[in-house]
Amino acid sequence: MPFAYIDTSSEAIKAFAGKYKAKTGQDPNSAAQYGYVGADIIVAALEAAGRDLTRAKFLAALEGIKDYKPLFPGPSLSYGPDKHQGSTATFLAKVEGGRWKVIAENLLY
């Protein structure tokens, strides 16, 4: 997922960044972005698994996530019994003016 610079991001990302900075005293970095997406997927799976949680229900819920759209830029993620990677797409970026700039998206591998 490309890095989302706060000053050029959506209002939802700006809200995330504000909450993150209020808690940590720092602006979010790429690890924070990946961590947010990972945690959000876990929460979605826990909610889908229901209150009578079992390992089997949790795994089935994780593997049932389809077309999850992360808060941050990047491809949608889908999982299944034989698909645990989420996406088979990547992107190509270069540094321009001291910032990462995406020059190609959804490159399949």
Map each language-model feature to its residues.
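Extracytosolic ligand-binding ectodomains
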Residues: 1-109
